[in-house]
Amino acid sequence: MSVPTQHYDAPGNQMIDIEQPVVRRILDGLPVGTALDAACGTGRHTAYLRELGHEVIGVDASPDMLAQARKRLPDVDFHEADLHRLPLPDRSVDTVVCALALTHVPDLVPVLAEFARVLRPGGSLVVSDAHLLASYLRPALARRPGPDGRPSLLAEYHRPLSAYLAAALPLGFQVRQCEEPRRPPRSLAPDTAPDPLPADMSWELLHWCPEASAAALDDSPVAVIWHFQLDGVRNG
């Protein structure tokens, strides 16, 4: 099991702590039906959709993540698949959730087009992603060692909000809600030593300049959460 899989949704993940309540608040207001958790990871949103009464399908490209999701939710239908080729028929779901995944996709259009394909007219797409401003002091994180033994990188594409609109609106999506939850202020004592980081992340600026990084990032948007609705006329 990879390190990201082990710690992805463990307590203390600030991004998830900030993102998850907003996503759940949006999901609380949607009609119950068939829901797709696209890039479901370990199934944190899958589980909540089940609690709300949805029939849920989970899709992820990572076997490690899916193993955790299946262990967590053995009665849910999970598929190993890429977001560009969802294993679902046209117009087969009422809601699509895609959480903290599109930052790893180089081109939004084909993925959002797949979401539009599987959504029924009038269906909802809920997307969360890392905010562009959150990347200023945080480059792409090193991940598990690659074939040569050196830490590999998981590519990240940080986008302005206009990029989501440029990709979504021509496909027939309408914006119902957009939220940019902010990082809570934090204070560090002058002599506070930063927590140790794994060796493959030891170069990150947040670790070496904690006070300056905290001052720059305090009260800045850390995530963006979109609620789009597919236009029934445009899609049908």
Language-model segments: residues:
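Conserved class I S-adenosyl-L-methionine
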Residues: 1-31, 44-48, 65-68, 72, 124-149, 155, ...
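Class I SAM-dependent methyltransferase SAM/SAH-binding core
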Residues: 34-85
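A short acidic, Gly/Pro-enriched loop at the edge of an enzyme's catalytic core
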Residues: 84-96
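A short SAM/SAH-binding and catalytic strip from SAM-dependent methyltransferases
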Residues: 95-108
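A short glycine-rich, Lys/Arg-flanked "PGG" loop and its adjoining helix->strand segment in the class I
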Residues: 109-121
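Short alpha-helix
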Residues: 156-178
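A C-terminal cap/extension of S-adenosyl-L-methionine-dependent methyltransferases
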Residues: 175-236
